[in-house]
Amino acid sequence: MRKKKLVFIAEDSIIQHVQGWDLSTNDKNAAVKSFSGARIADMENYLKPLLRKEPDAIILHVGTNNIRDESPRSVAEDIVNVVTQIQQDFPSTRLAISPLLPRSDNLELNDKIKEANKILKSFCSSRGLTLLRVTNIDLTCLNRRGVHLNRKGSSLLSNCYADFLKSN
């Protein structure tokens, strides 16, 4: 039997500077699992080996690579469907969804991101799912390419994740 709770942060690489060891505590062992370029359907497959370890909690950050070619509603629905399936298969695993973050490589996508997050918030509220409240992340929190978080953005997001982990 594990002494520390196991927490996975599964993400699509936008949060490349978030470190699991930095989020680990005396009672929680956090590990960041990054899947560069992953789309929502890919993440479903990537999660399978992680779920076999029966984690106590998962923070899921995905959708960044879908938003360019899919509607905001489709992206939000697909994310919620993945989380709902995990809940059904692993009811004791605490789940949280990290919202899509802004990007500066294509500013037009930010309207789609805002809409997807709005829909995601509504879905989460109606289904009793946890959508993390990520504030203060703006275009100054992105690297030069405008897709991934810089150190400032990673620090802000890490703090949000740490708050979730402290309360669970």
What are these regions (language model features)?
Residues 4-6, 143-144:
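A detector of helix-start/N-cap boundary segments at the beginnings of structured domains
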Residues 5-20:
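Catalytic nucleophile-elbow at a beta strand-turn-alpha helix junction centered on a G-D-S/GDSL motif
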Residues 22-30, 38, 42-168:
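Alpha-helical cap/lid subdomain in secreted, periplasmic
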